[in-house]
Amino acid sequence: LFGDTRRRVPRWYDLDRPVLQGALFGPESYALGAAAQKPYFNQQVSESLRECYRLFAQHTGREYGPVSTHMLDDASLVLVAQGAAQETARGVADYLRRERKTPIGVLGINNLRPFPAAEVVDRLKGKQAVAVLERLDAPLASDSPLLREIRTSLDRALESGSPVLEYPHLEQRELPVCQSVHYGVGGQPLRARDLIALSARLADGAGPTLYL
């Protein structure tokens, strides 16, 4: 900063291209903006995200979407996972089907917000039991974030669906049992043998939150 030469200082403000940053809102203006955010921004994100998935597939040849499935059509037990845990869960599902004839599949959640509620309900309806895998701990919370979204979606679909939110119709007999599963706490890896043991327990019904 001192001497014969100085580093160039970034031009924070360009008078030829003025931009308003960090504007202050009065209470009334802020309330109106918050109310307008949902119809003019939030409700458009899902469609924009689908278009991004389409363009990504067009450029790379790899198909992605809000959810992904693996051997789910005839499965009665489902492992719900996000991120890299999907690969481990798919490997376990392949092993259990091949070696133990267990009717198990995997549902991958690729975006938590906006939550793909209709797709999740459509793929979980009629299943016997669902293990929701989450890499976190949720002290003092009744449900962890992903499990809460799934249960809320199933409950809304159980209320005869919603034409506005496009929830599919769900009968009480089609409602799966959900099991909360936390893994990776303290940096522990997600092991295939743990998922195999979890799948055997899942067939007996849900219980308190399990830690892998």
Spans of model-derived segments:
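Redox- and metal-dependent alpha/beta enzyme cores, enriched for Fe-S-associated oxidoreductases
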Residues: 66, 70-100, 115-120
